């Protein structure tokens, strides 16, 4: 196709020259003139690859790409600023009683009153009523039934108290929290619990003075006999320093601040 086009252009050029020569013969004779005909040549072969040009201008910002997958978890950042103080939490449980403080200074003498004798009498009556109330509770528990061995009497007290409160209760009546030091005593207390329809009670064993060193409530060391359940004692939450007996006769270490029923032990010779 390209060759035909070149050939056609050549013919047209020759025809045009012929017309010029026939129309102006004298002028051509007088003046010699050279005419150059520019005809496009054939397409040449591809040249060598040129050098790398200068970088072009930045193009337009393209559309945002698709959302990629979530990357790996980054490293822990530095601690942020302290936030605002949160709302006040709910009221917690009552804590254990603290140690008794030192006695305070003597107060100023009161104003003499004619009713001082009456007030003294009322105060003494209040003390007596409180003592009678306590003794009535004790008698009520005793009437409900006790358990005996050759040397001991055991009383189940159905008043929920913390460990130290239960210990003081028994001491105030000439006894102590029950101390099962052999299989017979342990079985008797377990039977007592079952017949009362209970699941657990405090007994007189603790490691309050030294963690892991359990002793009886009279501070005598434990010997070879024990009834620890599987995995016990475990001192869960680092606060289990007292011991309970469950209905099966097994022992668990528990927190001293919880409340439950308990068993007092008395020597027969002191009753």
Swiss-Prot record:
Gene Ontology CC annotations of this record: collagen trimer; extracellular space
Alphabetical GO biological process terms: antimicrobial humoral response; complement activation, lectin pathway; developmental process
Pfam families xrefs: Collagen, Lectin_C
GO molecular function: calcium ion binding; calcium-dependent carbohydrate binding; D-mannose binding; DNA binding; fucose binding; oligosaccharide binding
Alphabetic keyword roster: Calcium, Coiled coil, Collagen, Developmental protein, Disulfide bond, Immunity, Innate immunity, Lectin, Mannose-binding, Metal-binding, Secreted, Signal
Coiled coil regions in record: 116-148
Localisation per UniProt entry: Secreted
Main subcellular location of this protein, as a coarse class: secreted
Signal sequence annotation: 1-25
Disulphide bonds in the chain: 170-264, 242-256
Biased composition (Basic and acidic residues): 66-75
Keyword Calcium part of the UniProt annotation: yes
Span of domain Collagen-like: 56-115
Binding site for Ca(2+) 3: 211, 238, 241
C-type lectin domain: residues covered: 149-265
Superkingdom of this protein's organism: Eukaryota
Stored Gene3D superfamilies: Mannose-Binding Protein A, subunit A
Biased composition, class Low complexity, residue ranges: 55-64
Region (Disordered): 46-113
Amino acids binding Ca(2+) 2: 232, 234, 240, 252-253
Binding site for Ca(2+) 1: 207, 211, 235, 240-241
Keyword Coiled coil: yes
Family: Belongs to the COLEC10/COLEC11 family.
Protein name: Collectin-11
Organism: Gallus gallus (Chicken)
């Amino acid at each position: 196709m390209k060759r035909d086009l070149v050939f056609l252009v050549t013919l047209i050029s020759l025809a045009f020259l012929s017309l010029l020569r026939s129309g102006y013969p004298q002028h051509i004779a007088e003046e010699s003139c050279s005419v150059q005909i520019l005809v496009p040549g054939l397409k040449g072969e591809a040249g060598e690859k040129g050098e790398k040009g200068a970088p072009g201008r930045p193009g337009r910002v393209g559309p945002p790409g698709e959302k990629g997958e979530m990357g790996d978890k980054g490293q822990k950042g530095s601690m942020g600023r302290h936030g605002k103080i949160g709302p006040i939490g709910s009221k917690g449980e009552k804590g254990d009683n603290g140690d008794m403080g030192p006695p305070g200074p003597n107060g100023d003498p009161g104003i003499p009153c004619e009713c001082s004798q009456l007030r003294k009498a009322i105060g003494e009556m209040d003390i007596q009523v409180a003592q009678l109330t306590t003794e009535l509770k004790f008698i009520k528990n005793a009437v409900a039934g006790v358990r005996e061995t050759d040397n001991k009497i055991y009383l189940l007290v159905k008043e929920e108290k913390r460990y130290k409160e239960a210990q003081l209760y028994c001491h105030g009546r000439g006894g102590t929290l029950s101390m099962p030091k052999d299989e017979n005593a342990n079985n008797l207390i377990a039977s007592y619990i079952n017949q009362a329809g209970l699941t657990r009670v405090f007994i007189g064993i603790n490691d309050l003075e030294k963690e892991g060193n359990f002793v009886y409530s009279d501070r005598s060391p434990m010997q070879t006999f024990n009834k620890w359940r599987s995995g016990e004692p475990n001192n869960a939450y680092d606060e289990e320093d007292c011991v309970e007996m469950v209905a099966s006769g097994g022992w668990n270490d528990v927190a001293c601040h919880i409340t439950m029923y308990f068993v007092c032990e008395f020597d027969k010779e002191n009753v």
